[in-house]
A protein has these predicted regions:
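Conserved catalytic-core motifs of GNAT/GCN5-like acyltransferases
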Residues: 113, 132-146, 232-235
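Conserved acetyl-CoA-binding loop-helix of GNAT-fold acetyltransferases
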Residues: 81, 87-102
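Non-catalytic, surface beta->alpha helical segment in thiol-disulfide oxidoreductase systems
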Residues: 228-248
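A conserved beta-turn-beta hairpin within the catalytic core of GNAT-like acetyltransferases
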Residues: 64-76, 86
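Short amphipathic alpha-helix that is part of the acyltransferase structural core
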Residues: 1-51, 161-163, 182-183, 190-194
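C-terminal "cap" of GNAT-fold acetyltransferases
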Residues: 140-165
């Protein structure tokens, strides 16, 4: 497999794997705008030259849009290989490229979000364990921080206190999200519309800065849905899934 690094220079012409429509699609435009602002902060987006979901996205942990203390580490935003790309070792290729790059940049190791059992839009814990990762912290909602250290003397990454006990003091449905995931540009407005039509208390909070992301009340900032103050899910949903959740 041949891979290419997406940069500010080729961003407009390259597809971004998780959303492969044209640049006018709101999902693509929102993701590319978010990426463009992150490249100067050290973000790397490495993908297959072929169209499809086969890529890794990572950034120095100090600049990551998650509430973690992991100074000197590299944080993996997303490692996604699916469809016909699965089963060929491409996930290992991408992770190995990240490891090599991170070592060359003097990073202490890698960290990434997962859970004890595979959850949608999170890394596969079996794959992480196979690759030498271990759990270094866990929030009350079961979201875990995994790490792979290059230095046995390095401090382990950990969640910030604000994220260890996911809870908010607000009734109704409250959704925290960022533009890191392109699907949000399409589906968050759908949920807002559905909630309004069905007289459901719903508020979407768009996290638009690294500082706000790093102080969020949830270990996951891409998409975190709360109901009456309690964390519910990180799984993006359409109108049907949302109404199924509401109706129990």
């Amino acid at each position: 497999m041949e891979y290419i690094r997406v940069t500010k220079e080729n961003l407009e012409k390259e597809h971004i794997c998780c959303a492969i429509s044209n640049n006018k699609d709101v999902q693509v435009s929102s993701k590319k705008a978010w990426l463009a602002d992150r490249f100067e902060e050290g973000l790397v987006f490495l993908k297959s030259v072929e169209r499809g979901k086969c890529f890794i996205e990572y950034i120095p942990a100090e600049n990551a849009w998650v509430p973690i203390d992991a100074e000197g580490y590299m944080y993996i935003d997303c490692l996604w290989v699916s469809g016909s790309f699965k089963g060929h070792g491409y996930s290992s290729d991408l992770l190995n490229a990240c490891i090599e790059d991170s070592r060359e940049k003097g990073r202490k190791g890698l960290c990434i979000l997962a859970a004890a059992k595979k959850k949608p839009f999170l890394a596969d814990p079996k794959f992480l364990k196979y690759k030498g990762f271990a759990v270094c912290d866990e929030a009350d909602n079961g979201i875990q921080l995994w790490y792979l250290s290059f230095d046995n003397d390095a401090d382990k990454p950990q969640f910030k206190e604000c994220a260890k006990h996911p809870h908010i003091d607000e009734k109704g449905y409250v959704l925290y999200y960022t533009s890191q995931c392109p699907f949000n540009a399409k589906y968050v407005p759908i949920l807002e519309k559905t909630a309004k039509e069905n007289d459901i208390s719903f508020r979407a909070i768009h996290i638009e800065s690294r500082e706000d992301a790093q102080s969020a009340p949830t270990p996951i900032t891409n998409y975190a849905l709360f109901h009456d103050g309690e964390y519910v899910t990180n799984e993006q949903m359409n109108d049907k899934k949302f109404m199924k959740l509401v109706n129990g």
